[in-house]
Structure formats: structure tokens, C-alpha cells
From Swiss-Prot:
Keywords: Cell cycle, Cell division, GTP-binding, Magnesium, Metal-binding, Nucleotide-binding, Septation. The keyword GTP-binding applies. Belongs to the TRAFAC class TrmE-Era-EngA-EngB-Septin-like GTPase superfamily. EngB GTPase family. Mg(2+) binds at S55, T77. It holds the Pfam family MMR_HSR1. One of its GO terms (biological process) is division septum assembly. It comes from Rickettsia canadensis (strain McKiel). Residues 40-212 form the EngB-type G domain. This is Probable GTP-binding protein EngB. GO terms for molecular function: GTP binding; metal ion binding. Gene3D superfamilies: P-loop containing nucleotide triphosphate hydrolases. InterPro entries: G_ENGB_dom, GTP-bd, GTP-bd_ribosome_bio_YsxC, P-loop_NTPase.
């Protein structure tokens, strides 16, 4: 039994994960709020610190290593990228936060863009808050979680690069303590883009968003 199976109450991945057998494609990039599209499809977003492995994880669950551009240089996702999966789901890659080596004005522009999207998207069903397993939860991760709760956004915690650590107990304890301070409960998952551990369970959790009701507030 994997760690992820324990976290999600030992439920097996459902056939809904077959959704990710379809080919996802890049459909839009938004560098400012006026460029944010409305596809009238459920959206799932990925957010995390620069170099946390967002693009690699998106490529892993979509079985396409060239879908989202991967770079070892933090801060290379400078816009919101939208990927269409079988006209059933939109995967949203948000700019990384934290130590990106970009001018302050650019960072502020990204913050405005991300905040606007999180506040106004009526199609957003779930946000995946990515945390580097080697680093643990940092102060800026906490601020993002608070922003999500402020905007009444459902989210789950995804520990990335799990192949680089030997034990998840400390991470699990850290996550549960963190969630307790937020008075929030959610899935906590462990995923490796390299070994593919946890990818199947993650796909299943994302596919469920297709039937999840939309928020009343619209974009």
C-alpha cells in the first residue's frame, strides 16, 4: 500500500483517471488579466514556489514530457498557461512564487495576475498547492493557502519530488499541523514526476472535479 492510498482512505483510483489517456494541448497563455480566457470548462490549477516541479508534474499526469515547458531556472513560468484535456478539463499552470530571479515589478505583476484569477474564476474547481518534499512548508506557502481560503477555494497539498526523501511521516505531521492552524481539511498527497509514484491517485482526484459543482461567483 502506498502512502497516497493511506491518505485518501485506501480508495483505489477509479476509472475516471482514464481521462488522462487523452492528449492535452496548450490553448492559451495570459500575461495580464485581460488575457485570461473563459473556456466554460472545469479548471484545476497548480501553484507552488518557483522550481517546485509544477511543469514536470503536469507533464507526468498528462503523459507528455513536452506539454509544459520545464526549466531548472526558477521563475520561467511567467504567465498563466492553460491546457485543454479532451474538451472536458482545463489544466492551469500558475506562475511560481518565491525566489524567482526577476525584477520586483514583474513579481508584483504575477501576484496581481494570480490573485485576480483565484478571486474571479467561476470555472476553478480545485487548486493543487505544490510543496517540495525536501523543503517542507514555508512561510510563502502558508500565505498562498490563506489566500486560497480567503477566496473560498478548495485545495489539496501535493508534496513533489517525493523520490528524493526516504520517509513521509515528518511531512505528514507538518501538513496536518499546518492544516489544523488553518482550520481546514484536505487531501495530502506525495508524488514523484521521476518515479511516477502517486501519479495515479492524483489523476483520480483531479478527474473527480469534472462533476464538482461550480462556484456561484463568475468571471
Amino acid at each position: 500500500m502506498t502512502n497516497n492510498e493511506k491518505v485518501i482512505n485506501n480508495k483505489k483510483s477509479t476509472d475516471s483517471s482514464k481521462l488522462f489517456r487523452y492528449q492535452a494541448k496548450f490553448v492559451a497563455g495570459a500575461m495580464n488579466i485581460n488575457q485570461i480566457p473563459n473556456f466554460l470548462l472545469p479548471e484545476i490549477a497548480f501553484i507552488g514556489k518557483s522550481n517546485v516541479g509544477k511543469s514536470s508534474l503536469i507533464n507526468t499526469i498528462c503523459n507528455n514530457k513536452n506539454l509544459a515547458k520545464v526549466s531548472n531556472i526558477p521563475g520561467r513560468t511567467g504567465q498563466i498557461n492553460f491546457f485543454n484535456l479532451a474538451d472536458k478539463l482545463i489544466i492551469v499552470d500558475l506562475p511560481g512564487y518565491g525566489f524567482a530571479n526577476v525584477p520586483i515589478s514583474v513579481k508584483e505583476q504575477w501576484e496581481v495576475l494570480i490573485s485576480y484569477y483565484l478571486r474571479n474564476s467561476n470555472n476553478l474547481r480545485l487548486v493543487n498547492l505544490l510543496i517540495d518534499s525536501r523543503r517542507g512548508i514555508k512561510e510563502n506557502d502558508k500565505k498562498v493557502a490563506e489566500l486560497l481560503l480567503k477566496n473560498k477555494r478548495s485545495f489539496q497539498i501535493i508534496f513533489t519530488k517525493f523520490d528524493k526523501v526516504t520517509d513521509c511521516k515528518n511531512l505528514t505531521d507538518e501538513a496536518q499541523n499546518f492544516l489544523t492552524t488553518l482550520h481546514y481539511s484536505c487531501n495530502v498527497m506525495y508524488v514523484s514526476s521521476r518515479s511516477k509514484e502517486g501519479a495515479r491517485e492524483l489523476k483520480a482526484s483531479l478527474a473527480k472535479c469534472i462533476i464538482k459543482p461550480q462556484r456561484s461567483k463568475g468571471r
